[in-house]
Structures are given as C-alpha cells and as structure tokens.
C-alpha cells in the first residue's frame, strides 16, 4: 500500500497541494482528475520523488519509497528517438545497474529477455529493433510504459499519457496500463483530462481542485455529477 498523509507543497505563497491524504492499493488503477493547475502533476512528481513536499509523508508498505520503487511515465514519453524500442526499454533498468552498461550498451541477457517481454506486454513484441523516431504517438507511449516497467517498480504513475492521442489510441494505451497494473499487482495512478476514456478500466477516482482532494470514490460508485463537481469546484 502507498500511504500519503498530509501532503502539502508550496510554490511561494501558492499551495499546489493542500493537506492531501490517501491510501492507494496494489492491483488497482486509480484515475486522477481535475482542471489544469489543480495539482495533479505536482502530486505525481511528489510521489515519484522529483519534488519534495513541504509537509506530510509518503510511505510504501510502511517505509519510505526507494528511487526504483516508483516509475513515472510522462506525456511526451521522454524517449530517445535515435535508439531502438528495445534500447529505450532497457534504459529503464539503469537505476538498478552500473552506469557503464548504458555507456557501452552492454546489458545482461536476463535484462534483454525482460525488456522483450515488456514490449510484448504492451503489444509491441515485433517492434524491438524499430527506431523510436519512426513510431506513432501511441506506440511511443507504449514504449514509455514498457521502459517504466523495466524499472521493476511497485508503483506505476502516468502523467496525462494520452493527452496527445486520438480517443481510440488513448483507450488502447490505458487498457495496456490497467492490464500490467493488475497482472503485476502494482499500484497504478494515471492523471487524465478525459476521464471518460478510463471508465471501462478504472478501479477508483481521485479528484483535485486547487490542490485539495475533493473526490475519492470507487469507480463502481461514481456518477457523472461527481466528475462535474470536481471541475466546477
């Protein structure tokens, strides 16, 4: 379980996060919604360790998360276009391996097998040798997900992973995320501007408004008014 308690983040006089507390469970995909500037990205960056909160705590199974425990997939993917899909996925293991392996491009055989398996997990098993720069937007996002999984995290975060994709491709990417969260028993959190895309696969919804947690509800108990209230808050 990932436990967030009293999380507060300030930028000057502005509170980007205001006393956020929530427990996130393994095997569940949580969808984070809210208007632009509501605090979604700040929350994900704090969970990933890219930002340090001013107050509050984050614990994974009762301890402080290690760097490799949490993986974050960005909207743009942050991939290297000149490298193959397989090489990009292998980069996800760098937090667990000596840095000289990246410089020389030498990875253990078991890491290569795992990376190929991750590409299969996201539906790109036949794309290992393709340069990322030649892939479509949806394929790039799936490579980014595979790379995050190569890190062997307990927590998988994705910040607006389908914002630049058409609805059909976006649904496919979200279905891939949901599948690996459940199959690998991960804690999954995805922020979205289009919450309807996640309706078939979400387990839980969290809503932020002005840095405050204003919605926490199982997907089965959610109605349209709940989502509307988050954006009207």
Swiss-Prot record:
Location(s) in or outside the cell: Cell membrane
Keywords: ATP-binding, Cell membrane, Membrane, Nucleotide-binding, Phosphonate transport, Translocase, Transport
Predominant location category: membrane
Enzyme class: translocase
Sequence positions that bind ATP: 34-41
Pfam families: ABC_tran
Enzyme Commission (EC) number: 7.3.2.2
InterPro entries documented for this protein: AAA+_ATPase, ABC_transporter-like_ATP-bd, ABC_transporter-like_CS, MetN_ABC_transporter-like, P-loop_NTPase
Molecular function, one GO term: ATP hydrolysis activity
Domain ABC transporter: 2-227
Residues in coiled coil: none
Topology of the protein relative to the lipid bilayer: Peripheral membrane protein
Superkingdom classification of source: Archaea
Known catalytic reactions: phosphonate(out) + ATP + H2O = phosphonate(in) + ADP + phosphate + H(+)
Function noted in UniProt: Part of the ABC transporter complex PhnCDE involved in phosphonates import. Responsible for energy coupling to the transport system.
Family: Belongs to the ABC transporter superfamily. Phosphonates importer (TC 3.A.1.9.1) family.
Subunit description: The complex is composed of two ATP-binding proteins (PhnC), two transmembrane proteins (PhnE) and a solute-binding protein (PhnD).
Name listed for the protein in its UniProt record: Phosphonates import ATP-binding protein PhnC 1
């Amino acid at each position: 379980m990932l436990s967030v308690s009293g999380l507060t983040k300030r930028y000057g006089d502005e509170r980007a996060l205001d006393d956020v507390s929530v427990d996130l469970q393994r095997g569940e995909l949580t969808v984070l919604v809210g208007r632009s500037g509501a605090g979604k990205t700040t929350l994900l960056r704090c969970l990933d360790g890219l930002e340090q909160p001013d107050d509050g705590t984050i614990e994974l199974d009762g301890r402080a998360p290690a760097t490799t425990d949490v993986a974050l997939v960005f909207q743009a993917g942050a991939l290297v276009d000149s490298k193959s899909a397989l090489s990009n996925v292998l980069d996800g293991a760098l937090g667990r391996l000596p840095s000289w392996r990246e410089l020389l491009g030498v990875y253990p055989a078991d890491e290569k097998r795992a990376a190929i398996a991750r590409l299969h997990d996201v539906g790109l098993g036949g794309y290992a040798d393709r340069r990322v720069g030649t892939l479509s937007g949806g394929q790039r996002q799936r490579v980014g997900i595979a790379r995050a999984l190569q890190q062997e995290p307990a927590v998988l975060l994705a910040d607006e992973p389908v914002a630049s994709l058409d609805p059909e491709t976006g649904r496919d990417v979200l279905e891939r995320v949901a599948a690996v969260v459940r199959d690998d028993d991960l804690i999954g959190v995805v922020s979205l501007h289009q919450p309807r895309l996640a309706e078939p696969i979400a387990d839980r919804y969290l809503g932020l408004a002005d840095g405050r947690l204003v919605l926490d509800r199982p997907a089965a108990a959610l109605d349209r008014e709940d989502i509307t209230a988050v954006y009207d808050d």
